[in-house]
Amino acid sequence: MDKFTCVEDIGDLRQAVAEALEIKRDRFQFTGLGRNKTLLMLFFNSSLRTRLSTQKAAMNLGMNVMVLDVNQGAWKLETQRGVVMDGDKAEHLLEAIPVMGSYCDVIGVRSFARFQDKAEDYEERVLEQFIRHSGRPVFSMEAATRHPLQSFADLITIEEHKAVERPKVVMTWAPHPNALPQAVPNSFAEWMNAADYDFVITHPEGYELDPKFVGAARVEYDQRKALEGADFVYAKSWAAYT
């Protein structure tokens, strides 16, 4: 696997879930797998759970782990292409990526949407540059449009607790004081569709997600109606592109 950024990258989903559950039952059965291997975790944005859980997972596999908070404790990096570098950013990301790749075996990247231009966000410029230029397998620890690690964990939780083969899963928009990006709901929708659950999305009008993530899900603006008969409810806030 050269990259893990979306559900399609994981291959056979049922097999992936089964293997994840097997590892969960005995977290230390593959401690030799990562011997003499190094994971580099790069954070362009803050993280708590993803940072800790990913680092712990790598340690369980016997890997060495390096963590870099970009623009904090390292040179500020310019991520836009074609700009004049006469500001406070000392190095361009394209120059730094091969250097980073030379010191590790796997790279995890966390880079949020700027939420100013949807088309630009959906290009996933930062993540894609690592995939193209690092020479290493790259996985997303949340990007502009998806959060595959969280969605995989959500799917595993549903599989562990479901009482019927094809449960009804409802993702409902919830209020939040801050404007949150769409990566988590996009990704959750993608994974629920891939799992072929009875999947419903409910939100106020104007908060529609991109059709490529909604997929085969039913969209119901009436929250009460959407929640009827739900086996699992996933509450998440997201902002709308204006």
Language-model segments: which ranges?
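Generic alpha-helical secondary structure signal
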Residues: I10-R14, E91-L94, R125, K212, ...
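Generic detector of short, locally flexible boundary/turn motifs and exposed helical patches
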Residues: K3-I10, F30-G32, N71-A74, D105, ...
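Positively charged, low-complexity intrinsically disordered leader regions
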Residues: M1-L52, K56
